[in-house]
Amino acid sequence: MPTRRRVALLTLLTAGTLVAREAQRNATHSDPAARAAAVRRKVAVATWAAPTEGRLMTRIVVDADPVLDYVARRRAEGAKGLTPMHVLGAAAGRALRVVPEANTRVRAGRPVSFDDVAVGFAVDIGQGTDLAPVKVVGADVLTPAQIATRVWTGVTALRDGTDPGFSRTTRVAALVPALAMKPLLKASDLVLGALGRPLLGQVGNPLGAVFISNVAPLGVEEVFLAPVPFARAAVYISQGTITERAVVRDGAVVAVRQFTLCLTGDHRLVDGVQCAIFFDALVGLLKDPDRLG
């Protein structure tokens, strides 16, 4: 048998063996939550390496009462499922209009603008055991209530297993051998991130230009999110738990309900001044959320 055929046959046999072993390893996890956690960990190991890109990281404390009052009023008017996270998403969409440099990704070594303004949300689909993104396009014009409706529609499909894209991605990730995961994610970086095209069930640029994660249900006040390379989102924001804090106002110490926002920005796209302008626009809208509709 010619050498090339032997190498090709050996490669196919090796790949088949690795896939079979991966399937057998997955089968040992009888608990669906354990299987999901194993897949997520495998993807995480293949996604990140030692950091090589510049990141800007900052935090800001926001008064919660204006947002909470707005949410309470809108829910009383019929805005089902509206939460502060959706208000934050609408504010982030408007802030992208103020700082258009943040609504870009790096492609072929240069910044390229997105065709739309999209914000992604991390949502819990496994009672704390699994997360998935829901991308909302048009976040710069949608009201918080409209964003809430779209997010909950996505959450329902993900939790019910009726989202075909996520199901396909999970199946592929479960079967791909660990050694092949990094090359697969490299391809995802090109197709999903740079070109913005769908791949293996994922939509292009699946996290949007800004990705938001509400860590409050975990009882966490602040955390800086780790950027996902293949998503190529420019800004990541975490929203911490709402707590009463002692604040000096007009020379007196008062108790104020507040939460912390932590921002991680891609320094290739935004600098310190632009992050400050973005945060200023964001916080201004959170202080007066009625401007969001």
Where are these regions (language model features)?
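C-terminal catalytic/motor cores of large multi-domain enzyme assemblies
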Residues: 2-293
